Amino acid sequence: MPRQKYEQIYYALKERIEAGDYPVGGLLPSENVLIGEFSCSRNTVRRALANLVRDGYVQTRQGWGVCNIYQPIETSAYTMGTIESFAETARRTGQNSATRVVLFTTCTADEALSRRTGFPVGTELFYLQRVHDLDGVPRIFNHNYFRRDCMPGLTKEIAQGSIYRYLEQVVHMSIVTSKRTITVEKAEALDRKWLTLDDFNCLAVVSSQTYNSDGVMFEYTQSRHHPSIFRFQDNAVRTAARTPAAML
């Protein structure tokens, strides 16, 4: 599907910002200049700029214009706004990656597992333990649960590559959304077995429930990250405070 005009402007400006065409702290071209360049309406330009504000690339300054505030994400950053496979994250951050499947089995969700993962009791599941290496060093230990009826052909060999690539390109599943929780937890025996924690006694844990386009939760994953490489980075926008009159 062709991109709408505001999306074309958004991506064009985003690429320029990331390439350093506009200095950090400097102003982007004015609305009138962008209207002339892209042959569009003022509302279209403003919609594109609003998306850049939302994504943390620019900030509007009343009476001045639109200011570039983009800072490149460090390679250790874990971003929350997108759903990425481990291999995709490694490519984005310029690191070499490898995945080892240290356990590949099946199980059925009982009440305890249902409460922990969100799968209904009785759901037939694949259960995997995987170790993700970055630049040859084990950095992430995963507990993966996948619905077997959503991917009956999953194998250990596939799991050593990219499961998401298999789901999207072979199963033709559309992966839509993921609910995530980040906690800090004490290191367990398996963490110490598979990750080189040294003097660290805790790690960052990202628990995610991922859904496909049919609204089916097909995956629950608990990713246990080495503290030295985990850094949460997101972009938050404060909405205007409600006045007392507006609260009435």
Predicted regions and their residues:
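Extreme N-terminal segment that seeds HTH/winged-HTH DNA-binding domains in transcriptional regulators
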Residues: 1-42, 248
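Short, cationic-aromatic polyanion-contact patches
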Residues: 4-6, 30, 67-82
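Beta-hairpin "wing" of winged helix-turn-helix
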Residues: 22-25, 54-63, 69
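Short, hydrophobic-biased segments on the C-terminal half of alpha helices
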Residues: 49-50
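Extended, compositionally biased flexible segments
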Residues: 53, 59-60, 71, 84-87, ...
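A generic "binding-loop/recognition-motif" signal
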Residues: 64, 86, 163
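C-terminal all-alpha effector/ligand-binding and dimerization domain
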Residues: 97-248
